[in-house]
Amino acid sequence: MRGSRQTTQKPDFPARAAPRGGSLRRLDEMITTCRACPRLVAWREEAARVKRRAFREWEYWARPVPGFGPSDAPLAIVGLAPAAHGGNRTGRIFTGDPSGDALYAALYDVGLASRPTATHRGDGLELYGVRITVPVHCAPPDNRPTTGERDTCRPWLARELQLLRPTLRAIVVLGAFAWQALPPVLAEAGWRLPRPRPVFGHGTEVLLAPAGDGRPLRLVGGYHPSRRNMSTRTLTPVMLRDVLRRGAEAGGLLTSPHHGGPGA
């Protein structure tokens, strides 16, 4: 953890350049070149060398995984980090792993995705009014980034939300890690934080006022659709769809089940 924090002080700390990302496309390109956290770089590349048997024919992405979705989205979804054999393999967040299977099926069910499955970057999947991102863009060992790695990655997420700010009206926050990571990011991106800070819980809602010009932002907390949460029924498909619908409503998206996009 200490090493990751020291990394942020180096002149070549890649995320220092995040404010120069003038568009989400450019920011995504910049993110994919980052090698700031030695532990994460080693792990993502090791996972690509020692592949799971089911994916031995794959050429793994093995780089930081950027956000996915339109640049004018009124709704964002913030998760945790790419999975070693999911996003780290396919190059798209929540794609190719059980968490993504649950999330994209739910997004499709509420009318926010063009298809219920996500298998690879060229599968034709589109999101309607939603952008998905994470506080940590590299796959971490045991799906557990350190706080230092989270802080090193923070400028990327802050800049992404700044670029989304003209249209962003709501964020669905999946899991306690993302909930805890967001306050300094949101403050930097232009919203006021309530005091005391709200405690994470499934279904928790918080309305943030803008720090200056702009519109307020509603946060909707939800359990992360991890394999464990889904298998133990800590989170069910119905519960996941509910928080996504609430986020969509807060974002002004009129969802239409299954296909056609919002308002179809």
Regions found by a protein language model. Name each.
Residues Q6-Q9, H258-H259:
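Low-complexity, intrinsically disordered or signal/transmembrane-proximal segments
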Residues T7-T8, A15, A264:
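Ala/Thr-enriched low-complexity intrinsically disordered regions
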Residues P11, P19-L253:
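A polyanion-binding, active-site-adjacent surface
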Residues G251-G263:
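Low-complexity, Gly/Ser/Thr/Pro-rich intrinsically disordered linker/tail segments
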